[in-house]
Amino acid sequence: MRAMRVIMNSMSEISESPPVLDEMVQRITERFSPDKIILFGSRARGDARPDSDIDLLVLFSEVEDPRQRAVELYQSLLDFPRPMDIVVSTTYRFERYRNVVNTVYWPASREGKVLYERAA
């Protein structure tokens, strides 16, 4: 069994029902084994409207085709009745560009909430 750590301490601050996020995180981790899942955008900031989407940055140590992996993630979550935006990248790329303004990594690193992180 692989080691993992799920971070739940900030879930009360997130403007999405925790059971939905818990289920999404569980499904993603079981099927895809990412390094980290970060919620960012309005739901992480706490200013989401009822029609706001769920923005997830899903990081892997390696991923050959990020777009294809994003499609696979979307397909695995089709039964969730929420609009979502899933960005797939590598942990290396996130760490390298997290301080670069106008990248998706910038807001994810500044305001994001880590929902899952694989134990080292």
Feature roles, as predicted:
Residues 52-54:
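Short, conserved active-site loops that position catalytic residues or coordinate cofactors/metal ions
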Residues 40-42:
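Glycine-rich beta-strand-to-loop/alpha-helix junction loops that act as flexible
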Residues 57-59:
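Short hydrophobic/aromatic beta-strand micro-patches
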Residues 1-36, 45-50, 61-120:
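Catalytic core of pol beta-like nucleotidyltransferases
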